[in-house]
Amino acid sequence: IIFSAVKEKRVKIYDERKREINLDTVEKAIIDFEKRFSGKTIGKDSIWDYIRPFIGEFQFEEFVDYTYEDLDLEKKVKAYCPYIVRYREFNGEKDDTVQMPLFWIFPEESKDTNDWFHVPDTIISVHQLRYPNQMPFSTNLFSLVKENKIQVFRPNGEEFNTFKQIEDLFVVKNNYVYYDEETGEETLKESFSDIVPEDIIAIRIGEGWKINRKSLEIKKQIYFFLPLYQYDEERFGQLGLRIYNKKHRNLDKQ
């Protein structure tokens, strides 16, 4: 849908500085990118069909509205940019990729409410929580969950057996080796620390996308989210909770 509109010049395209660019500029950049990183020379007449399978990422300029009282989230997309993603190495531990942003689209809000294409898959993304939204959202999340005022699920969507299982998620257990200088013996011990609202630094979101075939406007509907906490200076962990967005809380879970 997007590529057809771009090829037929039915939509204006821009670079990362929001300067309008022409189709020839994008096509030349794609040809140079493929020749450099895949060693293949592609013709202008086959560019868009050739790169379609390699569109592996989108960058969005979007706004997130938070309703702190009931943890409801809503996204509004202002602009987006598709990326070519080429894997040079993929082994489960290290993903070595090269990426190329193609163009930015700033669609107008669609007046046609019928001509939408619904992406069939649930899209998973990570959204960073930053001040000033982080603290009231995280604080109320802790309050609602710990007081059992909102229904939560395991990350896979299954229900918890007991409320104690939910409470235990807010405590991190670490194993460490204790060395006794007097005896010279090493003992494996456990330490416990509480997860606090300040530790929640991001949420993993499951969402549905739809795109208007005429205006190319993209709308997102958030189905659920999973809080992520700061595990150490370099890593974050999954708290172990799936919280459905307000519109999906009393429906059959997907």
Where are these regions (language model features)?
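Short, solvent-exposed coil/turn segments at beta-strand boundaries
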Residues: 68-79, 213-224
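Extended serine/threonine-enriched, polar tracts that run as long, contiguous segments within proteins
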Residues: 81-83, 226-228
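Conserved beta-strands of PAS-like sensory domains
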Residues: 101-105, 239-246
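A domain-level signal for the mature, folded cores of soluble proteins
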Residues: 1-69, 86-91, 107-214, 232-235, ...
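Extracytoplasmic
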Residues: 53-55, 75-77, 100, 198-200, ...
